[in-house]
Curated annotation (Swiss-Prot):
It comes from Metamycoplasma arthritidis (strain 158L3-1) (Mycoplasma arthritidis). GO terms for cellular component: cytoplasm. It is found in: Cytoplasm. The gene is efp. This is Elongation factor P. Gene3D superfamilies: 2.30.30.30, Nucleic acid-binding proteins. GO terms for molecular function: translation elongation factor activity. Disulfide bonds: none annotated. GO terms for biological process: peptide biosynthetic process. The keyword Cytoplasm applies.
């Protein structure tokens, strides 16, 4: 059991039959009242994100998540196909479990697969990934108050805003958490 005061980003726990991973956690205490803990969590089975509130001192059951390194092979249209790097076993994960992650996946990429008691839940990507720019319109510098940005399309068909100097064919770093441009690769 984990005390909710110990919940922080990355911790996994079970509650009401669901398995959650903490994305953000904030603690607040008002006057003489009891402390409250608000956590933004992702349900690893459905992929949905919600905010849960707990009163200080509550306990939740820890979920023991097994992580396995795998290679992304291809998208079959209904699921993504991954292969274990050691046993060469192939598994499929339905697309609705990895909608956001699909924006950053390219063939041969290494990912971490999260499993709970042999049930495949979802995949975990590195914080930043390197992707190639396939379409970058020429931007015209205008009268801008802040840094000018333009929309470019990446090799995964994901569209991201970048500075004007990014050109077609360049490789850039993109955050997998926010989907924003981080820098040149």
């Amino acid at each position: 059991m984990i005390n909710v005061n110990d919940l922080k980003s990355g911790v996994t726990f079970q509650l009401e039959g669901a398995i959650y991973v903490v994305l953000e956690a904030s603690h607040s205490k008002q006057g003489r009242g009891q402390a409250n803990v608000k956590v933004k969590v992702k349900d690893l089975r459905t992929g949905s994100t919600t905010i849960r509130s707990f009163t200080g001192g509550e306990k939740v059951e820890r979920a023991m998540i097994e992580k396995t390194n795998m290679d992304f092979l291809y998208n079959s249209g209904e699921a993504i196909v991954l292969m274990d790097q050691e046993t060469f076993e192939q598994i499929e994960i339905p697309l609705n479990h990895v909608e956001w992650e699909l924006n950053f996946l390219k063939e041969g990429q290494k990912v971490m697969v999260r499993k709970f008691q042999e049930e495949v839940l979802d995949i975990e990507l590195p914080a930043n990934v390197t992707l190639k720019v396939v379409s970058a319109p020429d931007a015209v510098k205008g009268n801008t108050a802040q840094a000018a940005q333009k929309k470019v399309t990446l090799e995964t068909d994901f569209v991201v805003e970048t500075p004007l100097f990014i050109k077609e064919g360049e490789e850039i770093l993109v955050s997998t958490e926010t989907g924003k441009y981080v820098g040149r690769a």
